Curated annotation (Swiss-Prot):
Name of the gene encoding the protein in the UniProt record: ND6
Protein name, per record: NADH-ubiquinone oxidoreductase chain 6
Top enzyme class: translocase
Chief site of localization: mitochondrion
Lineage: Eukaryota, Metazoa, Ecdysozoa, Arthropoda, Chelicerata
Family, similarity comment: Belongs to the complex I subunit 6 family.
Superkingdom in the source lineage: Eukaryota
Functional description taken from the UniProt entry: Core subunit of the mitochondrial membrane respiratory chain NADH dehydrogenase (Complex I) that is believed to belong to the minimal assembly required for catalysis. Complex I functions in the transfer of electrons from NADH to the respiratory chain. The immediate electron acceptor for the enzyme is believed to be ubiquinone.
Keyword NAD: yes
Keywords assigned by UniProt, alphabetized: Electron transport, Membrane, Mitochondrion, NAD, Respiratory chain, Translocase, Transmembrane, Transmembrane helix, Transport, Ubiquinone
Molecular function per GO: NADH dehydrogenase (ubiquinone) activity
Length: 149
């Protein structure tokens, strides 16, 4: 792995840990998970592992953060100028011939090959059923995920 990928992973982890607003946390976790899945794909050249990581981790995190966002008050997100300048400078300093140029070589067709169609459909159905069950359970106990007038 190159230095720029390690630098990006560390930076995204620090942003996730230092953010205080759930939406900012969620967006940094989504970026971190997508970046890690791309790294797994390039290391193993096997797309099902990266796809499973995206579906399982992000599916669970979206459900958890959906509940957390409903609990926290409606406050504005505060963006720090120093942090945004650091982030843009870091993106500028990533070499052009780095990991980001390998993104063009991703073959999406490997994900949907005939061998993995059953597993993909099973994972999608599982995530939809889990989301439905959790949202039904929360509406039964009148949790603050929905506001009833």
């Amino acid at each position: 792995m190159l230095f720029s990928e390690i630098k990006f992973l560390i930076f995204m982890s620090v942003i996730c840990l230092s953010s205080s607003h759930p939406i900012l946390m969620l967006s940094s976790l989504i970026l971190l998970t997508l970046f890690l899945s791309l790294i797994f794909y390039f290391i193993y050249q096997f797309s099902i592992m990266s796809m499973m990581m995206i579906l399982i981790i992000l599916g669970g995190m979206l459900i958890i953060f959906m509940y957390m966002i409903s609990l926290c008050p409606n406050k504005k997100m505060s963006f720090y100028k120093k942090l945004s300048v650091t982030f843009t400078m870091m993106l500028i300093l990533i070499p052009y011939d780095s990991f980001m140029t390998k993104l063009e070589m991703i073959n999406i067709n490997k994900i949907y090959s005939v061998n993995f169609v059953n597993m993909i459909i099973l994972m999608m159905i599982f995530l939809i059923v889990m989301l439905t069950i959790i949202s039904k359970n929360l509406s039964w106990i009148n949790a603050p995920i929905q506001k009833f007038n």
